[in-house]
Amino acid sequence: MKTRPLSLRTSVLMIAFFLTVSMSASTNAEDLPSLKGKKVLLVYGGWKGHEPEQCVGILLPWLKAEGAVVDTFSTLAPYADQKYMESIDLVIQIFTMSKITAEQEKGLLTAIRNGAGIAGWHGGLGDAFRENTEYQFMVGGQWVAHPGGIIDYEVTVTDKKDPVTKGLANFKMHSEQYYMHVDPNVKVLATTAYSGKHASWIEGATMPVVWKKTYGKGRVFYTSLGHVAADFNVPQALEILKRGIRWSAGSKYEPTEQWVKPVY
């Protein structure tokens, strides 16, 4: 079978599309705080199935290219160092299904309440310390199920104005579709709906996928996407995470946003 060459009109349209996407991402990035000079604590570990090391390999080069000053730790020990935590602008955490000491939890939560930002994804933030309800209060949600395991599903961008999701279209994922217990007051930026194929009683249910909130003075960003590092090959998934990180990094320097929007 011979492949027909693209017409000039088709080629021009394709170029225009990719330029528009590129310009949109650039424009929205300008609406978010810069990472230049920000002190970032990148903490990774916990369950290996979520590929923490590989995810660090994706984020670390980008963070450094953005001008962030990054400390990486494969332990939660820094959380207990009060003086160190006071110097941090942003915590990025991927530490699934782990234990945190009372001293470490207090150090982390105090830092966020006092103005440091925190950002994370999937189980690394949303299923980290199952016994610690104050931590879950800070995050705004907790994983409880992923019906069907690895499946195809769609993510709907519901907030078209927020700089974290502005300009992004709906997109498809082949991964775990998280079902979570979520604070009904978080500012939801993207959602997903369940087919009912794997749990008939939730057919048509809608669940937040991406949200933002505050805890004390600190900005909190969460996305349930990113079961494995390859999930960030989906451009929108990676772009949302990067924008969410930048938003959170402005926690000590930007005005507090109004995020509480009761649904009841």
Residue ranges of model-derived segments:
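Catalytic beta-strand/loop cores that center a nucleophilic Ser/Cys/Thr
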Residues: L63-K64, V144-G216
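Boundary at the C-terminal end of the N-terminal hydrophobic targeting segment
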Residues: A25-A29
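Bacterial N-terminal signal peptides
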Residues: S11-S22
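N-terminal secretory signal peptides that target proteins for export/translocation
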Residues: M1-L8
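Extracellular ligand-binding/catalytic regions of CAZymes and related secreted enzymes
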Residues: E30-K39, A65-A68, K83-E86, G196-M207, ...
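A glycine-rich, often tryptophan-bearing local segment used as a flexible ligand/cofactor-contacting loop or short
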Residues: S98-G167
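Short, solvent-exposed loop/turn segments at secondary-structure junctions
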Residues: K48, S98, L125-G126, A193-G196, ...
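Helical hinge/lid and interdomain linker segments adjacent to catalytic or ligand-binding clefts
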Residues: E30-S34, L41-V43, W47-G126
